Amino acid sequence: AAGANDRIWNSLQKLCESSPDVFLRYFANVAIQTACEAWLGPNYQMTAQVNLVHPGGDAQQAHRDYHLGFQTAEVSALYPSHVHELSPALTLQGAIAHCDMPIESGPTKLLPFSQTYLPGYAAWRREDFRETFEAHYVQLPLSKGDALFFSPAVFHGAGSNVSSNIHRMANLLQVSS
């Protein structure tokens, strides 16, 4: 629905500049560090965007993210297979719930094990893949403060916010080696 989604782009830098103490407490969290270092090793870099989905906000279509996830299928197909295999290992996706997110508020839908499908960066726009995603995704309710981390190659997408009063807010993290 139009107007059902708001973002604060580059929220990491904006928080650091406006409230350094809060920034340090938030991002020095040992859980964030542990997840990031387990996936990427030390010296990772992070970007963040706060995403707010109001009641009535539509679901996203299933997709993959960085690095190849934002290319067209034709451009993705130009990359050799080893890039498709290695690209997801360079980034970790994360979301930190800033409110309770029952299923009706539309937390992230995930297709387990879809990250193992090597041609997925070129194929995720296909209707048969979208149908498979919708038939088999899992979705977890989150409590305020919960964090969800996953490979950018996992087919995923935000669910519909069918609630009448939950303004679903999450801090979306992209962490790179």
Role assignments for model-derived ranges:
Residues 62-67, 110-113, 164-167:
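Short secondary-structure boundary/capping segments
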Residues 1-74:
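Non-heme Fe(II)-dependent double-stranded beta-helix
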Residues 123-125, 154-155, 159-177:
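Non-heme Fe(II)/2-oxoglutarate
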Residues 48-50, 94-96, 171-175:
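A structural signal for short, well-ordered beta-strand segments
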Residues 37, 80-84:
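Catalytic micro-motifs at enzyme active sites that drive phosphoryl/nucleotidyl and oxygen chemistry
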Residues 47-48, 90, 104-106, 167-169:
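Residues that flank catalytic or metal-binding motifs in active/ligand-binding sites
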Residues 78, 87-159:
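Double-stranded beta-helix
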Residues 74-80:
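Short Pro/Gly-enriched beta-strand edge/turn motifs at strand-loop
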